[in-house]
């Protein structure tokens, strides 16, 4: 598989009541195909979030969208465009960051969390200098982070509830 220049294909998910902003790095191939967040069936994001809010795992895109907004959680990615090979964060180059100022100006975001190291590093390099808002690093829910069990991920992610 060759590296390809990719542009983020879908908008952020948030509304005027969003209090937590979760930033991934860049959508996986599967997410780009579905035009929605965390579309790879082995990504544990939706299982972790459902556990945190003591709810069934949302299945459809509409259920996922409603679930996040109902719980005042916004979703976006740190990267607006990049060169990437498949879904591999380690292959990301030529980064153009997203302007999260759009969300910060429209919603009372209390906490910004990055889902994984690639998102956190991009945030600190490109976005933090613009916003002055610190982000928290959370362990990646990606299947590539297999060392973390679902139980361990849920424990680490509980801090998003301390908004």
Language-model segments: what does each one mean?
Residues 19-25:
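Short, hydrophobic/glycine-enriched beta-strand segments
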């Amino acid at each position: 598989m060759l590296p390809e220049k990719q542009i983020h294909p879908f908008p952020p998910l948030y509304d005027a009541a969003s209090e937590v902003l979760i930033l991934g790095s860049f959508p996986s191939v599967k997410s780009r195909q579905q035009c929605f967040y965390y579309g790879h069936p082995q990504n544990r994001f939706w299982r972790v979030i459902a556990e945190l809010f003591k709810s069934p795992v949302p299945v459809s895109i509409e259920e996922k969208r409603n679930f996040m907004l109902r719980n005042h959680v916004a979703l976006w990615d740190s990267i607006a465009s990049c060169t990437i090979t498949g879904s591999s964060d380690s292959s990301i180059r030529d980064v153009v960051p997203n302007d999260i100022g759009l969300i910060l100006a429209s919603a009372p975001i209390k906490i910004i969390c990055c889902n994984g190291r690639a998102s956190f590093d991009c945030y600190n390099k490109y976005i933090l200098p613009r916003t002055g808002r610190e982000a928290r690093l959370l362990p990646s829910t990606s299947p590539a982070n297999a060392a973390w069990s679902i139980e361990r991920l849920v424990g680490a992610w509980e801090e998003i509830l301390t908004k």
